[in-house]
Amino acid sequence: MNLIDVKNLLFKYKMYSGEKEEVIEHTAIDNISLSIKKGDFVGILGHNGSGKSTLAKQLAALLKPSGGIIYVGGMDTAKEEQILDIRKTAGLVFQNPDNQLIGNIVEEDVAFGPENMGIPAEEIEMRITKALASTGMTAYREASPGALSGGQKQKIAISGV
C-alpha cells in the first residue's frame, strides 16, 4: 500500500476581479498523478508559481482538489470527516519557519501541535524529547526560537510536525 496516492489531480484558484466582481479561475495543478511509498524520499522541483506549494498543501489537506483524488494513508483528502486524521499523518513546514514558530522557547513550539490534538501531557513530553533528538536539536530545548539560525528554525518546525 502506498502512503500517498495522487490520481489526476486538478486544482484551480478562484480569483475575483475588482470592479466587475468577475470570478477568474487560474489552474495551478493540471492532471498530476504520483504514488509515494513509506520510506521514499521525494523531491518536487519547479519554477516559481509552478504549483509545488499548492501540491504540498493538497497533500496536507489544507486545500481541496478541484478534480482528481488524493489518498494519504488510505484517507481521501476531499472527505471532511477524514481531514483531522490526515493532518495527524501529514504535516507541512513552510519555506520561512518564522511564520510558524510561536512559542517563547523551542519545546513550546514542538508541543503546540500535539497539545491542540488533545494528546496527554506525558505523551507530549515523550514526543518532544524524541522529535528534538531526531533532528539533532535536543540542546536547544530551552532556547528562544528567535536566537536560532534559519536552518535550526527549520529543524524545530520539522520537530513540531
Language-model features: locations:
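Conserved ABC transporter NBD signature motif
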Residues: 68-78, 86
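Conserved ABC ATPase "signature" region
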Residues: 122-140
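Short helical segment in ABC ATPase nucleotide-binding domains corresponding to the A-loop/adjacent helical element
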Residues: 98, 104-115, 125, 129
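Helix-to-loop junction immediately C-terminal to a conserved catalytic motif
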Residues: 60
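Conserved ABC ATPase signature
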Residues: 144-148, 152
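The feature captures the beta-strand-to-loop junction immediately N-terminal to the Walker
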Residues: 45-47
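ABC ATPase nucleotide-binding domain "signature" region
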Residues: 43, 156-161
